[in-house]
Curated annotation (Swiss-Prot):
CDD domains: EF1_alpha, EF1_alpha_II, EF1_alpha_III. PROSITE patterns: G_TR_1, G_TR_2. GTP hydrolase that promotes the GTP-dependent binding of aminoacyl-tRNA to the A-site of ribosomes during protein biosynthesis. Mg(2+) binds at S20. The gene is tuf. It comes from Sulfurisphaera tokodaii (strain DSM 16993 / JCM 10545 / NBRC 100140 / 7). Keywords: Cytoplasm, Elongation factor, GTP-binding, Hydrolase, Magnesium, Metal-binding, Nucleotide-binding, Protein biosynthesis. Residues 13-20 are annotated as: G1. It is found in: Cytoplasm. Its EC number is 3.6.5.3. PANTHER family: TRANSLATION FACTOR (PTHR23115). This is Elongation factor 1-alpha. GO terms for molecular function: GTP binding; GTPase activity; translation elongation factor activity.
Length: 435
């Protein structure tokens, strides 16, 4: 493991805007890829006559390996800059990308938003159905404030490398982000060409008009979020493995608090208690884990069948909250008709996904000011923001957003789409026996 400070990065943006190529380029220039993997990807791309897509092939290759090789550590994609050690926590292009973005974004310290400057592509991303808009809204709701906007495909503008087009995109995307409450001092824009690496790790000869930092230099300007080590322990579980000769190994990211070898932890909602025998991160044994660490930890006293993805490990004296009902502020992103009381979408929160029924529409609010505009509305439609009450259909750990951000923000999914996103304001706890 690198001794540099570690940041988790998510790469977002509309389909076909060049996310994979950009990630591949970063990994190739600054990453942990060996020549062999790169060569194989180049050959695979050549065979299919898609030379320019070798980076995307590279990612597919890595993804396959990740899906095949079940190891304790979460072998995310990693690269280093002068200042930081980065983990890319989701390679885009995934069917479940929005859902992953919500469960994954709870882990991201910053985002690279890839926006194509090509005529037609940029407009598609910013249309009502476009993922550029959707991902911007999601990033904000999920608490990602640091965003680097990589305006890609600058070689395909008309004329090529057009400064005017770049400025137009900066202006429009900037206005949109500002309207959703982004602090624009933490949002940076850089014109890039992903396949050639222009303005990614090296300066572009073709865009002399741009004198700002490269993407890599902007990555080095990111700020490290403070570690919430003083809060009670919370580790949402991503996977649970049973490893011969070791025992039960839950895997997850420490969101708050500190986990030490020898600690007793409780898994909620089941209420089972286990003792931590060892902790690993990226194949390295460690004595204690802090917020931001992706770990596998071996526990004694718990069986594999007792715990599952979506459970949360926490401290015994302040155990994770199991919700009987919770109050949330939501934004309806997309719904074909309207959302009313009784509507039951699947709520994706931290690593869990559980259907939750809306039991009350308390008030409709202005998303930009947060002020109430209507009491007890009959229904909500796309674009509306509201305070609602929700009841999980089965046991679910939910925390207040202001106390445990990663366990208090969620997405609502239905019909294969993200219907809305929200943050938890209050929780009515359910009594769970700790055994």
């Amino acid at each position: 493991m690198s001794q540099k400070p570690h940041l988790n990065l998510i790469v977002i943006g509309h389909v076909d805007h060049g996310k994979s190529t950009l990630v591949g380029r970063l990994l190739m220039d600054r990453g942990f890829l060996d020549e062999k993997t790169i060569k194989e990807a180049e050959e695979a791309a050549k065979k299919l006559g898609k030379e320019s897509e070798k980076y995307a092939f590279l990612l597919d290759r890595l993804k396959e390996e990740r899906e095949r090789g079940v190891t304790i550590n979460l072998t995310f994609m990693r690269f280093e800059t002068k200042k930081f050690f980065f983990t890319i926590i989701d390679a885009p292009g995934h069917r479940d990308f929005v859902k992953n973005m919500i469960t994954g974004a709870s882990q991201a310290d910053a985002a690279i938003l890839v926006v194509s400057a090509k005529k037609g592509e940029y407009e598609a991303g910013m249309s009502a159905e476009g993922q550029t808009r959707e991902h911007i809204i999601l990033a904000k709701t999920m608490g990602i404030n640091q965003v680097i906007v990589a305006v890609n495909k600058m070689d395909l503008t008309d004329p090529p490398y057009d400064e005017k087009r770049f400025k137009e995109i900066v202006d429009q995307v900037g206005k949109f982000m500002k309207s959703f409450g982004f602090d624009m001092n933490k949002v940076k824009f850089v014109p890039v060409v992903a396949p050639t690496g222009e303005n990614i790790t090296q300066r572009s000869e073709n865009m002399k008009w741009y004198t700002g930092p490269t993407l890599e230099e902007y990555l080095d300007q990111l700020e490290i979020p403070p570690k919430p080590v003083d809060k009670p322990l919370r580790i949402p579980i991503q996977e649970v493995y049973s490893i011969s000769g070791v025992g039960v190994v839950p895997v997850g990211r420490v969101e708050t608090g500190v986990l030490k070898v020898g600690d007793k932890v409780v898994f909620m909602p089941v209420g089972k208690v286990g003792e931590v025998r060892s902790i690993e991160t990226h194949h390295t044994k460690i004595e204690k884990a802090e917020p931001g660490d992706n770990i596998g930890f071996n526990v004694r006293g718990v069986e594999k069948k007792d715990i599952k993805r979506g459970d949360v490990a926490g401290s015994l004296n302040v155990p994770p909250t199991v919700a009987d009902e919770f109050t949330a502020q939501i934004i309806v992103i997309w719904h074909p008709t309207a959302v009313s009381v009784g509507y039951t979408p699947v709520v994706h929160i931290h690593t869990a996904s559980v259907a939750c029924r809306i039991t009350e529409l308390t008030s409709k609010i202005d998303p930009k000011t947060g002020k109430e505009v209507e009491k007890n509305p009959q229904f909500l439609k796309s674009g509306d923001s509201a305070i609602v009450k929700m009841k999980p259909i089965k046991e679910l750990v939910v925390e207040k957003f202001r106390e445990f951000p990663a366990l208090g923000r969620f997405a609502m999914r239905d019909m294969g789409k993200t219907v809305g996103v929200g943050v938890v304001i209050d929780v009515k706890p359910k009594k769970v026996e700790i055994k």
